[in-house]
């Protein structure tokens, strides 16, 4: 069995800015700190939580109609993806790292749902990131709130 990989994308706001939730990978600060000591079951639980939140946010705005085209696009753009996770997680990686270089989302096997079809990909990507961070922070505050507030230090 392949070891569970870190979701880190190299821009950790928990260590650099003191955020309770990383703006990059969406892990909680204590998960970032303790990641290397977690067993594969614990790591998978973290990834599963993040995957569900990503699918919830992206699935309300975008539809993947061709997973093979999405894979080809990811490979062409050299964007890594974890085949054990939902294609919506792959799409999230693509948008996070490459949205400014995408002219036609349909070439990647993806289309915006009707209510978002008139929104630029940059604006949509920013909305997705903002909503995802808010959802992750709400989950953190609900279950792991730090003394004294909103989870930010």
For the regions a language model picked out, list residue spans one by one.
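N-terminal cysteine/histidine-rich coordination modules
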Residues: 1-63
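Exposed alpha-helical structural elements
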Residues: 7, 42-45, 69, 90, ...
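Alpha-helical protein-protein interaction elements
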Residues: 26-27, 82, 132-135
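Short flanking/linker segments adjacent to small metal-binding domains or redox-active Cys/His motifs
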Residues: 59-116
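C-terminal, charged low-complexity interaction regions
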Residues: 101-153
